[in-house]
């Protein structure tokens, strides 16, 4: 039996962009939340979040050892991916 290519298996309905887009090749975390993100967030949206996260960590001097910093980033991630108002780095302006 020959495997058939299913393009739908390589896409997800992205919660940020509200359309089918290429999915992340692997869950971003090795847990249930990582699996959920892989099934609902496109690779494009995840890469954009990682850029935002890096700016927030750098600008706010966040330590990933601090549980409050981790909670803050989790909240901001969910807001970003759900198109809600999230905290942006001060020097950042969205592309028009």
Swiss-Prot record:
One of its GO terms (cellular component) is cytosol. It comes from Psychrobacter arcticus (strain DSM 17307 / VKM B-2377 / 273-4). This is Probable Fe(2+)-trafficking protein. Keywords: Iron. Could be a mediator in iron transactions between iron acquisition and iron-requiring processes, such as synthesis and/or repair of Fe-S clusters in biosynthetic enzymes. The keyword Iron applies. GO terms for biological process: cellular response to oxidative stress. Residues 21-40 are annotated as: Disordered. Belongs to the Fe(2+)-trafficking protein family. It comes from the Bacteria. GO terms for molecular function: iron ion binding.
């Amino acid at each position: 039996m020959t495997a058939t290519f299913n393009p739908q298996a390589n896409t997800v309905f992205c919660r940020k962009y509200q359309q089918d887009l290429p999915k992340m090749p692997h869950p971003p975390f090795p847990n249930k939340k990582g699996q959920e993100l892989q099934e609902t967030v496109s690779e494009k949206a995840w890469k954009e979040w990682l850029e935002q996260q890096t700016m927030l960590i750098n600008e706010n001097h966040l330590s990933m050892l601090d549980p409050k910093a981790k909670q803050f980033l989790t909240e901001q991630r969910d807001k970003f991916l759900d198109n809600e108002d999230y905290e942006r780095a001060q020097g950042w302006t969205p592309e028009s």
